[in-house]
Amino acid sequence: MARQSDHRACGFSRRGFFGLASTAAGLFIREAWAGSRKGRLIGSDPALLSPFEREHFPSLSLPPRTRNGAKVPIVVEMSHPMTPDHQVTSLEVVNETDPIPGKGRFHFTPGNGAIYVAFQARMDEGDSEVTVTADCNRHGRWQIRRRISIPEGAGGCAGEAPAWGRVAGDDIHSPEIRIPEQVQRGGIRRGEVIHPQLKIRHPNRTGLAEHDGSFVRASEPLYLEKMEVRFGGEAVSKFEFTPALSDDPFITFALLASREGSLEVRLVNNRGQRFETAHEISFS
């Protein structure tokens, strides 16, 4: 049975109620035009979408069932243009019935070249739905939703944060950047969209504990809060994470290799600790 949240202590929504109330299909897609609160439900078969709709709806990949709620892989990508006058400016990933619903908000620019982000997040046990909302600067918000099932006892939302003085040494390692296109082909071509991968050893804990079937606050959380991507001295992306981020995350994003230059990634956790790394982009 799914645990209930302690509303007085944390203000978290109940998974049990929403699980019983939801009768939607495993996948549904909704369009919400800018300036309008009205939406439109579309069938679960993406092949039925028009080219315009396929361009605007995000693609969400995650396991339909997993036994590791502490590290659920999430991949979001889109075929939407990324030009100054027509672009997706942000994505948001949410599981509304989790004790920490928000999984991350991701801001993009034409410097990304494409919409792509992959990361890992904590989710609670039981049946739930993950929603991705994409914001187009011309056509407003577009949503996709997929179901996920995590067996009882396999949820990943509980976890006390280590004390300030205990986060050092082997607990945290500096971030590293890997460019898979460079590794596979030995070089990068001008104008292609590459997919840098960022690896960092860093604990990310919600600060929640389970007590009598409810989540209660046991400690302050510890987590990577922000990640900024710069290329050639210009801002490309800003990612905002929550305590639902998994330990030692492996984060992938898109970058338009429009020129040679330094790719820089800067991170900060909620305790103000900063981490950064750089990788030189050069053409073969």
Predicted regions and their residues:
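Short acidic/polar inter-strand loop motif in beta-rich domains
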Residues: 135-144, 269-277
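Surface-exposed, short loops/turns at beta-strand junctions within beta-sandwich domains
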Residues: 120-127, 255-260
